[in-house]
Curated annotation (Swiss-Prot):
Annotated segments matching region Disordered: 145-173
Residue span, sHSP domain: 52-162
Binding, Zn(2+) 2: H107
Annotated gene: CRYAA
Compartments where found: Cytoplasm; Nucleus
GO cellular component entries: cytoplasm; nucleus
Residues carrying Deamidated glutamine: Q6, Q50, Q90, Q147
Protein name according to UniProt: Alpha-crystallin A chain
UniProt feature, compositional bias: Basic and acidic residues: 153-167
N6-acetyllysine PTM sites in chain numbering: K70, K99
PTM section of the record: Acetylation at Lys-70 may increase chaperone activity. Undergoes age-dependent proteolytical cleavage at the C-terminus.
Residues binding Zn(2+) 3, per UniProt: H154
PANTHER family linked: ALPHA-CRYSTALLIN A CHAIN, HEAT SHOCK PROTEIN HSP-12.2-RELATED
Species of origin: Ochotona princeps (Southern American pika)
Modified residues (Phosphoserine): S45, S122
């Protein structure tokens, strides 16, 4: 019995202009054929499955909301515990860093690390910032906005990450 090691030419990635899961947040979790050519997946495969690449983009891995009264960041950090996360505010930026040491999973050993930096609006009250991690791995960073003309208090400080036992209430986009 022959086993094909290389995909046929029409199922291979066609270069940097086509979406691929190789370098996104799911690195190390496997790559599917429909991730390489999502626009052809419905024509090639009789059993069409929605591309995970498109689903992930639509779900809002990192979502920033800024309305009149509040500034909120939602970030999917399901592979990290609160002890693995560092959240700090420095001047007009919030920096979220996650790192866990090498651990074993289904496919071998893996270690993960990310660093995100977001600009805070100038009218966010930095003394009232909060950060929590839901049971389903959604990090929520939020802060109220102050009325214009008041000092928002810009200094460097760490924001503790609290753990919630319920899943996130963040609606998907």
């Amino acid at each position: 019995m022959d086993v094909t090691i290389q995909h046929p030419w029409f199922k291979r990635a066609l270069g940097p202009f086509y979406p691929s899961r190789l370098f996104d947040q799911f690195f190390g979790e496997g790559l599917f054929e429909y991730d390489l050519l999502p626009f052809l997946s419905s024509t090639i495969s009789p059993y069409y499955r929605q591309s995970l690449f498109r689903t992930v983009l639509d779900s809002g891995i990192s979502e920033v909301r800024s309305d009149r009264d509040k500034f909120v960041i939602f970030l999917d950090v399901k592979h990290f515990s609160p002890e693995d996360l560092t959240v700090k505010v420095q001047e007009d930026f919030v920096e979220i860093h996650g790192k866990h040491s090498e651990r074993q999973d289904d496919h071998g050993y893996i270690s993960r690390e990310f660093h995100r930096r977001y600009r805070l609006p100038s009218n966010v009250d930095q003394s009232a910032l909060s950060c929590s991690l839901s049971a389903d791995g959604m990090l929520t960073f939020s802060g109220p906005k102050v009325q214009s003309g008041l000092d928002a208090g810009h200094s460097e400080r760490a924001i503790p990450v609290s753990r919630e036992e319920k899943p996130s209430s963040a609606p998907s986009s």
